[in-house]
């Protein structure tokens, strides 16, 4: 019984995100980018583990950041994630997420869904783990075999090495602004 509720908690977080994504797609014309962003922000903040994600993407450079820089990076990554969802999930024509499976993965879970959009099938694998608050949270999203965390890790570490912390944050902010402008 405990195992089922454990897997259910992990899956429930994914369902919470997906329900929000379907909602913003269905109401995309009414919400526009800003409305989609505002609707998603509290949900994304609740279901993703941005403290963990920040540590992973910074890797060996994480200890070099002070507490304020860490918090700022976590907030920037959260805003970037929300802006990406708000930009990409901007119209609805019957798309749906279909549950595939949940399996144990080390101390975490891998929750798989298939996104049906017309004839396209896109696999979303959500790597879940227990966050510091004891809740299941999304640590990584793998879309058709491509890990978002791996992509960001390489990109952000390279930016940090070349431009320093302020350059990295400035770049993330520019990405957020670009997504907002592209959605107008």
PLM-predicted stretches and their roles:
Residues 15, 20-24, 98, 112-114, ...:
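Soluble periplasmic/extracytoplasmic beta-strand elements of cell-envelope proteins
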Residues 7-85:
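Early exported N-terminus immediately downstream of N-terminal targeting peptides
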Residues 143-184:
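Low-complexity, intrinsically disordered terminal/linker segments enriched in charged
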Residues 121-151:
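Short beta-strand edge/turn micro-motifs at domain boundaries
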Residues 39-42, 49, 53, 104, ...:
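Intrinsically disordered, low-complexity linear regions
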Residues 77, 101-103, 114-117, 128-130, ...:
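A mature extracytoplasmic/lumenal domain signature
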